[in-house]
Amino acid sequence: MRSILVIPSFVAVLNAFSLFPKPHDDFKYLITFGDSYTDNGRLGYYGSHQAHGPPPGVMPPEANVTASGGLQWPQYVEASTGATLYDYAIAGATCDNNNVERWAAFMNANYPSIITDEIPSFKADRKTKLYRGVTSANTVYALWIGTNDLSYTGILSDSQVKGTNITTYIDCLWNVFDAIHAAGGRRFVILNNNALQLTGLYRPLSDGGAGDNQFWQNKTLYNQTEYAQKMLEYTTSSNTMIDYGVPFHLLVKNRWPGSKVAVYDIHSLIMDIYNQPSRYLEPPHNVVGYYKHCDVNGTNCLYGPGRLDSYLWYDELHPSNIIASYIAREFLNVVSGRSKYGTYWEHW
């Protein structure tokens, strides 16, 4: 695990802190924001209710098959700790539709974003009995967003709103923290961007990646090697901005007084799985291909070959179910201050 020492007047940590004094003892609530990497079924509610979310105080039913092909990582955290999960993540979401908006034809509307939908839903729920037991001491807030902001339908193809860029997306992360902090949140985990260049979506066809597919229907018309390199640049650059941005805003700008923030390095975790698959996946290990194969319309899907637990990727974009379980396991280590993938900051 990484521990950070900064100017004493701003007081960070000398040793990696735990978000709770004893692992999981006071971990009663997990509140999550994000996209399909975190969504436990919320988009399905919007799809069946004319693009509207649930009424205040109501959490939609959890799905047992998510974008991982099984449970999603917050559900594994919920099961292993007994914590109550309030998952506001919506598949397809960006951080803010005012920066990057993405059309969802099946809803005849844009995908909801964190700023325009998830945070307002969270604020509305806070006024209901749903949040009666939630305190700053017993609740962890987790944010994982960027996959769609940086995507082919976003910044990668220059499809963002005019005048916005990667730094606008990064600023949105801090705005999300502002809203949660104003609502009483003090324990934060931010998950950085996945190694998207390794996904079938962005890996060149010549290197085992997908051709034209449901997420990028005309991929083969582009210079795929160039776009894979751009995605590597975008993910690593944004992750560096996150690494430097958290201590700057927390300690120098005094933006979230009294808070603890852990940066969870998902990118490195996925790279470790990619480079050492035998430690994580069932044989025969497959870190290049993916399990679910559909046509460009997302239909006529075939699965395999082999078992899902042999795969790093479920489809062209999403980590598989077994990877979701590893993300959850390491998340608990991050929360407990025991993870080599965690960098920890505290404002006293």
From Swiss-Prot:
InterPro entries: GDSL, GDSL_Est/Lipase, SGNH_hydro_sf. Gene3D superfamilies: SGNH hydrolase (3.40.50.1110). Pfam families: Lipase_GDSL. Optimum temperature is 50 degrees Celsius. Glycans are attached at residues 64, 165, 218, 223, 297. GO terms for cellular component: extracellular region. Induction: Expression is induced by sophorose, cellulose, oat spelt xylan, lactose, and arabinose. It is an enzyme of class 3 (hydrolase). Keywords: Glycoprotein, Hydrolase, Secreted, Signal. It catalyses: an acetyl ester + H2O = an aliphatic alcohol + acetate + H(+). This is Acetylesterase. It comes from Hypocrea jecorina. The lineage of its organism: Eukaryota, Fungi, Dikarya, Ascomycota, Pezizomycotina. The gene is aes1.
